[in-house]
């Protein structure tokens, strides 16, 4: 089965960025599409308004909620494929409805999806949240063993370097969703996942269990996101990056 498309297949006439709060989060596509984004559909309050037109609904639990509301306004029929995509986007953005950003409207939308299209949501939930590859389980065991604790155990940090990936022979795609692991430790207020991108570049994912505003913490380091889930990109040696994170989190926790 063939999915997706090759960049050379067509020249896009209208480009939409969904759930992308900052142009730098486009990654490798920044140089290609960065100055060509016609519309951004988002729910991050930290959106930097980089697109020609921007639709941000900060009260939405997920960007796919906003997409769903647009689909209703435009009277677009809900096909099985559309329903699967909307549900998957909502479920993943809300941690399968366990995050604080899950609203009553979020549940209403899912009920409407279920009522109007016979999609097996349980199957999607299992595939997205329960099933793990052998490589993923290896990574989870490894990062749990090397988890670091700071600020009287209020901050936990896991680091996934290129050396770890190479040693374990695990693909980088297995790293998705690791950010929730540090918060599983009792008493932790902020959990941080560091993923090495290149020699002196690290992608930071930050999660908050209580009152710490990780959006503000990450914004102080050039990033952003939600109050409970945010991220940024840091440069330097791993030790320098760790120190920068610890200092920023210490200030963020102190201001709560």
Residue ranges and their predicted role:
Residues 1-30, 34:
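N-terminal small/polar loop signature for handling phosphorylated ligands or for N-terminal nucleophile
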Residues 11-12, 92-220, 225-256:
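Hydrophobic helix-and-loop "lid/oligomerization" segment in the mid-to-C-terminal part
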Residues 16, 37-41, 53-56, 156, ...:
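Hydrophobic/aromatic beta-strand patches that form the interior of the parallel beta-sheet core
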Residues 17, 40-41, 91, 125:
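Generic enzyme active-site microenvironment
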Residues 20-23, 44-46, 162-163, 197:
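Short glycine-rich anion-binding loops that position phosphate/pyrophosphate groups of nucleotides
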Residues 25-28, 50, 203:
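Short glycine-/acidic-enriched loop or helix-start segments at secondary-structure transitions
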Residues 29-33, 53-56, 104-105, 207, ...:
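Short, glycine/charged-enriched secondary-structure capping and boundary segments
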Residues 41-109:
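Short alpha-helices
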């Amino acid at each position: 089965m063939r999915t997706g498309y090759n960049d050379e297949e067509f020249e896009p006439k209208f480009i939409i960025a969904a759930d992308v709060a900052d142009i730098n989060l486009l990654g490798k596509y920044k140089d290609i599409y960065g100055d060509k984004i016609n519309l951004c559909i988002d729910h991050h309050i930290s959106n930097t308004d980089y697109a020609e037109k921007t639709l941000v609904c900060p009260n939405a639990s997920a960007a796919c909620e906003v997409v769903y509301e647009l689909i209703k306004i435009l009277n677009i029929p809900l096909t099985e494929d559309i329903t699967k995509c909307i549900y998957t986007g909502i479920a993943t953005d809300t941690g399968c409805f366990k995050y604080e950003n899950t609203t009553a409207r979020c549940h209403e939308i899912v009920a409407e999806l279920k009522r109007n299209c016979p999609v097996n949501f349980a199957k999607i939930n299992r595939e997205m949240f329960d099933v793990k590859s052998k490589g993923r389980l290896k990574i989870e065991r490894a990062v749990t063993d090397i988890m670091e604790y700071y600020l009287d155990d209020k901050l936990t940090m896991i680091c996934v370097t290129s050396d770890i990936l190479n040693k374990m022979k695990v693909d980088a795609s297995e790293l998705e969703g690791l950010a929730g692991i540090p918060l599983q430790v009792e008493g932790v207020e902020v959990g941080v996942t560091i993923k090495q991108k290149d020699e002196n570049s690290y992608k930071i994912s930050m999660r908050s269990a209580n009152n710490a505003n990780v959006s503000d913490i990450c914004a102080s380091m050039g990033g952003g996101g939600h109050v409970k889930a945010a991220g940024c990109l840091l440069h330097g040696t791993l030790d320098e990056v760790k120190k920068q994170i610890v200092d920023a989190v210490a200030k963020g926790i102190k201001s709560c």
